[in-house]
UniProtKB/Swiss-Prot annotation:
Reactions catalysed: GMP + ATP = GDP + ADP
SUPFAM superfamilies named among the record's database cross-references: P-loop containing nucleoside triphosphate hydrolases
Stretches assigned to the Guanylate kinase-like domain: 9-188
Gene: gmk
Protein name: Guanylate kinase
Principal cellular location given in the protein's record: cytoplasm
Entry's family note: Belongs to the guanylate kinase family.
Native species: Chlorobium luteolum (strain DSM 273 / BCRC 81028 / 2530) (Pelodictyon luteolum)
Length: 197
């Protein structure tokens, strides 16, 4: 009798401009796929009250983070508002080896890096706004953006949209429920396909 091959976890990556509903859709996906886990990022920022290492973030010293960078320990990393953030390659591999499917929130550069590392085990989903005008309205309705911040987010969105055709699927979030259903269908199809090793 042939030995049964254990299932290897899969990676679902969301990339999207700010204001496209990514966080809301991610919550709905995790509700629909209860065995899927949200990837925990590493950071050098100080732990806040109530946060737990390994749950909210993997909290690393600046020295340890920079050592991981030098040793190729990140799928992606960035320096943002004075702190490093990144996705640890080893933690991702460990989850996959345990058969755990992960949902990752990465920028387009990080998504491209992940696809190079895990071409057959990853689904890249780009969530797009119906138009730049709608995106601008959504960002303004948050009332959390000053004029300069809004301008920067819209410029970044234009750049990110230029990468959309390199993703496995592009979902336009015009109506939230339709977008959620489209994302769930894409993930269901991906998870049901046979993996190549």
């Amino acid at each position: 009798m042939a030995e049964e091959i254990e299932r290897v976890g899969r990676l679902v990556v969301f990339s999207a401009p700010s204001g496209t509903g990514k966080s809301t859709i991610a919550r709905r996906v995790l509700e629909r796929f209860p065995s899927m886990r949200f990837s925990v990022s590493a950071t050098t920022r100080p732990m806040r009250e109530g946060e737990v290492d390994g749950v909210n973030y993997h909290f690393l010293s600046k020295e340890d983070f920079e050592s991981e960078i030098r040793n190729g320990g990140f799928i992606e990393h960035e320096f943002f508002f004075g702190n490093h953030y990144g996705t640890l390659l080893q933690k991702t591999r460990e989850a996959m080896a345990q058969g755990t499917d992960l949902l990752l929130d990465l920028d387009v550069k990080g998504a491209m890096n992940l696809k190079k590392l895990f071409p057959d085990s990853s689904l890249l989903v780009f969530l797009a706004p119906p138009s730049m005008d709608v995106l601008k309205e959504r960002l303004q309705s948050r009332k959390s953006e000053d004029e300069e911040s809004l301008k920067l987010r819209l410029e970044r969105a234009r750049l990110e949209l230029g990468f959309a055709d390199r993703f496995d699927t592009v979902i336009i979030n015009d109506t939230l429920e339709d977008a959620v259903e489209a994302v769930i269908l894409a993930i269901s199809n991906f998870l049901s396909t046979k993996q190549t090793t």
